[in-house]
């Protein structure tokens, strides 16, 4: 696969694909096909203020053979009030790799966790400390919520280009999900084709560390695959895809020129993976009384009022149950 060359100014940068790292003046190969879902743990959890790389040595990360997918619908506009509402957890990422410093995007979804792409974390070459995150970044001179250094990486066990990154607290002992409110995830029960969406992140064709939002519609949806008609470029890798309720419905990975951009859709399989690995991740319906995952739902097996819960005093399998039919009860006949 031949690399595409991109002109670089002091503020704009080159690109990384699944098979090709594109920079000026030469292209270097980098593969991100590994599907290892075992966590990569750093040797130390000590947090220091991350060094911020500026200027033209930055290279946006992108997926598949292309990521600079500017479609006829090129409704991109800059977000300057980055600390407000659902924009606050959108995060600027730098990866300090042996071959250079790369930029990407992500979204905070837990007290100490962020979602991005597998091909973004692959650029760390197994060293989580190489990945730095700057939530709500305004520009390369203004990081209102500071920076955080990764300590553990967990890749999605399925085919989707998705990864979880866990961070150490900062020097003030604050976690990344404490300086910003984590994003709310959609249960995606009502997500369908033709719905309005936005992709928000840090594209590499714009001034460094500036947040941009693209607007469009879903054009395809099946399994973990979601496609849409809005425009993105390298650096948008890992950007959250929001629905009209400002809930995260997917994580952007890249696209195909003149055709579509795409994301990992948060379907049931992805949702289960996230819940298994992020204890405090919040989905929009978690608090609903009929949600089986809600601990207050009497049908939740962990609810002590559930008659099937062995800790329920009325459960005949509970040794504290006074039912004489329970042979484990010392008061049983």
Swiss-Prot record:
**Domain of life where this protein originates:** Bacteria
* Family annotation (SUPFAM superfamilies): Trypsin-like serine proteases
- Pfam families under this entry? Trypsin_2
* Keyword tags: Hydrolase, Protease, Repeat, Secreted, Serine protease, Signal, Virulence, Zymogen
Q: Which GO terms describe its molecular function?
A: serine-type endopeptidase activity
Active-site residues, as the UniProt record annotates them? 119, 161, 237
Q: What does this protein do?
A: Preferentially cleaves peptide bonds on the carboxyl-terminal side of aspartate and glutamate. Along with other extracellular proteases it is involved in colonization and infection of human tissues. Required for proteolytic maturation of thiol protease SspB and inactivation of SspC, an inhibitor of SspB. It is the most important protease for degradation of fibronectin-binding protein (FnBP) and surface protein A, which are involved in adherence to host cells. May also protect bacteria against host defense mechanism by cleaving the immunoglobulin classes IgG, IgA and IgM.
Q: What is this protein called?
A: Glutamyl endopeptidase
- Reaction(s) catalyzed by this protein? Preferential cleavage: Glu-|-Xaa, Asp-|-Xaa
Write out the ranges of the annotated region (11 X 3 AA repeats of P-[DN]-N).
Answer: 289-321
Q: What is its EC number?
A: 3.4.21.19
GO biological process annotation, one example: proteolysis
């Amino acid at each position: 696969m031949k690399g595409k060359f991109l002109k670089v100014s002091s503020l704009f940068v080159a690109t990384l694909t699944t098979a090709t790292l594109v920079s000026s003046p030469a292209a270097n190969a980098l593969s991100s096909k590994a599907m290892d879902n075992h966590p990569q743990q750093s040797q130390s959890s000590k947090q220091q203020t991350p060094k911020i790389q500026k200027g033209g040595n930055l290279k946006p990360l992108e997926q598949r053979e292309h990521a600079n997918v500017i479609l006829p619908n090129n409704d991109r506009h800059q977000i300057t009030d980055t600390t407000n509402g659902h924009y606050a957890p959108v995060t600027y990422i730098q990866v300090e790799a042996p071959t250079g410093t790369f930029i990407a995007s992500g979204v905070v979804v837990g007290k100490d966790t962020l979602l991005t792409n597998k091909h973004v974390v692959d650029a760390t070459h197994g060293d989580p400390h190489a990945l730095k995150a700057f939530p709500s970044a305004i520009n390369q001179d203004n990081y209102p919520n500071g920076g955080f250094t990764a300590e553990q990486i967990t890749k999605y066990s399925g085919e989707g280009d998705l990864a979880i990154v866990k961070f150490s607290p900062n020097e003030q002992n604050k976690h990344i999900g404490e300086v910003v409110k984590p994003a709310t995830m959609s249960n995606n029960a009502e997500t369908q084709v033709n719905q309005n969406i936005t992709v928000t992140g840090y594209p590499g064709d714009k001034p460094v560390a500036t947040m941009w939002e693209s607007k469009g519609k879903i054009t395809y949806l099946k399994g973990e695959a979601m496609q849409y008609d809005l425009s993105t470029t390298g650096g948008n890798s890992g950007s959250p895809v929001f629905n009209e309720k400002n809930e995260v419905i997917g994580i952007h990975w890249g696209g195909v020129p003149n055709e579509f951009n795409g994301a990992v859709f948060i379907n049931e399989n992805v949702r289960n993976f996230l819940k298994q690995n992020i204890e405090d991740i919040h989905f929009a319906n978690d608090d609903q009384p009929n949600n089986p995952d809600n601990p207050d739902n009497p049908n939740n097996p962990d609810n002590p009022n559930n008659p099937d819960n062995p800790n329920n005093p009325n459960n005949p399998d509970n040794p504290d149950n006074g039912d004489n039919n329970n042979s484990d009860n010392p008061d049983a006949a």
